[in-house]
Structure formats: C-alpha cells, structure tokens
Amino acid sequence: MRYNAVDDPLCYPDTHVLRNEADIADQAELDEFEQLMFDSRAEEELPGGNLDFMHFCALHHHFFQDIYEWAGQPRTVRTGKGDNWFCYPEYIGSEATKLFTELANRNFFADAKDEAEFAQDAAWFLSELNAIHTFREGNGRIQLVFLTLLTRHAGFKFDEDQLRPEEFLKAMIVSFDGELGALADEIKRVI
C-alpha cells in the first residue's frame, strides 16, 4: 500500500513517486533501485551512536543517502497509510525526543529478564516509533535495523533468518491501534 501525503513537494508532478538521485519516475523501478542501494549500504559498517534519535536519523542517512537528498532528515509533509495518519511533521522532533528519552530511561531494555519481556518492551517502542514515522520513506527498514541494534545491546541475538516480513508488517499495522501482542510475538521469534 502506498502512502497518502498532503501536497508532497518531494514527489514528481502528478505522481506519488518520490524525487530521487537517479531521477527514476517509475515506482517499480525506484523500488528496485532502493533495494539495490539499501543492500549495498548494508554491507558497510553502520554509523555509531547512542541509540538515540540522532543515531536513528544517521542510520536512515546511511542507507538512503544514494537515493534521496533528504536521507536522514525528518519529513516535512503530513502522511499516512490507509486511514491512519502519522505524527504531523511539526511534532516529530518533540515526540521522537520524548520516545528516545524514555528508551534511555528504560536502559534500552537491557534489563529485560528474558526474551519475552524484551519483545514486549521492543514492541511498544517500535509501535510508537512507527506512529511518529520520522521519514517520508524507509521507516520500516530503519526500524528493523534499529531493532537489531537494540536487541544486541540487550544481550540477545537477532536472527534475521527467522524474520517473516509479511507477518511482521501485519503486526506493525495492528500495533498502530495499540495491539502489541502480534508484534511482540514476531520480535520474540527473531531473538
């Protein structure tokens, strides 16, 4: 499902295709280019950081710098998917600061007694982060990268082979309405 956006200057005229560094105006071609560039950057060392909002933005920049000139920068347009609208851009900074402060106050979930507790905490965090939807594109992928870092920081192993993308996406969608059980289950599956 494509995004809904209000007056999006980042798109080519009369399309929903985001302007990009390769000047690709076809969505299917852009999707392929995005994946190729993302996979290429995944082979490189990730930017270091403190698991804070700046680190989250640096990760987005790392993976999307070859695709979008605004990589790593919070979005400036209102956007949503389906009937759900994400955090308005004028509140992204303050909401993200609150969320990442809470994450730090909770010691990045490193005190979780087991995988189930970590998964529940991480599900809450990801659902909130997804509702903020910091970037115009690439949120889900960067959220997974960040989840990998959180998992490792908490002393658990992230097993990408256990990830079920379709089920994870469905769980993210229902988490928007506060239902965290499915997302916690999917997270527990990968750790």
Task: Name what the model sees in each region.
Residues M1-I191:
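FIC/Doc superfamily catalytic core
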